């Protein structure tokens, strides 16, 4: 039963990571590509980490070997680091793109540019 849960988590992970890869190729500009890739790969990595944690806790229950608890905790710490750094990195890339003059393809309103102009005046 645990194996099916692990395989389901891995299947969801692979699906979302593939969708993120497709987003990199299909979307028109850096902002939509960044959005698609960041959201999909974050969600995919969450499920991959859940699969590792479930595996480690199942093995811990079977063997009582503390290295599996360590593996589960390290996986959760890595997941926490990803959840903190992935959005920050995406924001930094988007901001750098905007500051370098690469604007969205179909932007109607650019509030960030308007605020920057007001600040400069």
From Swiss-Prot:
Disulfide-bond pairs as recorded: none
Q: Which InterPro entries match?
A: PhaG_MnhG_YufB
Pfam families per record: PhaG_MnhG_YufB (PF03334)
GO molecular function, a single term: sodium:proton antiporter activity
Which domain of life, per UniProt? Archaea
UniProt record similarity statement? Belongs to the UPF0091 family.
| Entries under NCBIfam families matching the protein | CPA3_mnhG_phaG, PRK12672.1
| Protein name in the entry | UPF0091 protein PH1428
Its taxonomic path starts at:
Archaea, Methanobacteriati, Methanobacteriota, Thermococci, Thermococcales
